[in-house]
Amino acid sequence: MSKAPAIGIDLGTTYSCVGVFQHGKVEIIANEQGNRTTPSYVAFTDTERLIGDAAKNQVAMNPSNTVFDAKRLIGRKFNDPSVTSDRKHWPFNVIDDGSRPKIQVEFKGETKSFYPEEISSMVLLKMEEIADAYLGKKVTDVVITVPAYFNDSQRQATKDAGVIAGLNVLRIINEPTAAAIAYGLDKKVGTEKNVLIFDLGGGTFDVSILAIEDGIFEIKSTAGDTHLGGEDFDNRLVNHFVDEFKRKHKKDISSNKRALRRLRTACERAKRTLSASTQASVEIDSLFDGIDFYTSITRARFEELCIDLFRGTLGPVADAIRGAGKNSSGQNFSKSDIHEVVLVGGSTRIPKVQSLLQEFFNGKELNKSINPDEAVAYGAAVQAAILAGDKHEAVQDLLLLDVAPLSLGIETAGGVFTPLIKRNTTVPTKYSQVFTTYSDNQPGVLIQVFEGERSMTAHNNLLGKFELSGIPLAPRGVPQIEVTFDVDANGILNVSALDKSTGKENKITITNDKGRLSKEDIERMVQEAEKYKADDELQRDKVQAKNSLESYCYNMKQTVEDEKVKGKISEEDKKTIIKKCNETVEWVDKNQTAEKDQYEHKQKELEKVCNPIITKLYQAGGGMPGGMPGGMPGGMPGSGSKASSGGPTIEEVD
């Protein structure tokens, strides 16, 4: 069998999407519910693990064990201010594990905790399964997208999530870059075009400016807000309705997780409605203390509740334009240099967001030709095809230049940040600079690596540090230490320091100091992920066995109670079957967590009672009434009425 093609996965904060490039075009793949985007949700219940729509659909009943927003935690420290503020909004528990966040849930009656990478790996696994089902073969090679703003740690953690899911991550690429590829394929342009990508999704906001010429994409600048998106608009609606409920019913629902979650689901629906209509109604039965909550909201009121957030999207647009450097005629970049404005992300469907952006660009038509939910996965699928060596002419002449999202450098005397790789430098890239000692007879230097845009390291983000020791004693300023920064195509950073006189070298790949996963951690998580997958399959078999047993019972009862069999079956036989079926149904109700073989065993017992009677019925009157399916569910032969001798025991399904 030929190898499965590589796929592109848009791993979103709230929703994810998967695409594949084959037969010369990209296909966005629908999940088993027929949806082309899948919620980035994982739920843990008493009996099973659910991922995607199934997880999001049961969130109201199980809020504290339904995990979403893992992308807001991935690659961050527990005490990161954004994690601290997000935790207030989450119904699930986040704990501190050696300064790394872990999500704590109740699963199958036990308390379990997972790293964000593990949760993301479950979502990635789901996306891969969606692709497997569509392609009919197992996919291993993927390209995964991340926000342009993600720092080194977040990129590495996302890659780790792919590895835990058993995937071969060909590359991590920026979401706007992916959207640009989608756009570039749709619009083959000869002359250079400057494109501004405005990506407002469920959880993050990114603005990027790209120069596209002859199939070559160059990212000129990126800006954004890692914490702005559709969920923030939902929160405004939730707060608005919590206040309304207080006013109308003098009750505060804000401490009731389930009521809040049901309200949030209704708010998300209302928000989507308001993109197409000017009014939306909200109807929730028995929201709190038996009170039905029926209300409505207008588009104008929704816009008023969120106007500061909507206007706030224009700041990063201006920042990106300022950061784009010079235009083709050597002048500073200005908004008149933008040829196209492209909308990406579901939240760009909001009319007010579109009109504010259009006003900012003096009435320019916005580009909505790409489905905003699918553009990123579309581009990732194309990039996956390129990296996997697809020879199709549609991707042949496409070249991609990505950029470093933040300046990278080291601390020099007095806590000054000295950048070696400037923000928006095209990657992969390598840069070396010679430094020297600060004091006489200094035996070693401490190389501290930072990312950020501030002039003092205290305000930037420490990525890692290492020492270069054994420098020959000499007056200050004499030793020559060459520091090299090397960023690879995935945006992963290697830093080395070389003492030119001795040839001594030391280096660091920016990993564990930022709460990265060690190789052992990843291997353990890969094994656990496989175990959970096997558990899921076991659970599925269990459910099938239980359903098979139940439907056998109901079919049997239906058959003997059918008017058509009157006179063809004795009352005694009829009672025997009904009694045995009722006993079995009762047993199933009491044994919801039995094993698969217990259910199968019960079904065999039941068949031993029913089969001889049904055979008599056949002989008495030909065809079988009651529409019993051929071979009956479970298709198990058997006869006799006492508890069967050997034979498997039964298991239950829920």
Curated annotation (Swiss-Prot):
Residues 639-648 have a biased composition (Low complexity). Keywords: ATP-binding, Nucleotide-binding, Stress response. Residues 621-638 have a biased composition (Gly residues). Residues 621-654 are annotated as: Disordered. InterPro entries: ATPase_NBD (IPR043129), Heat_shock_70_CS (IPR018181), HSP70_C_sf (IPR029048), HSP70_peptide-bd_sf (IPR029047), Hsp_70_fam (IPR013126). PROSITE patterns: HSP70_1, HSP70_2, HSP70_3. The keyword Transport does not apply. The keyword Transmembrane helix does not apply. This is Heat shock 70 kDa protein. It comes from Hydra vulgaris. The gene is HSP70.1.
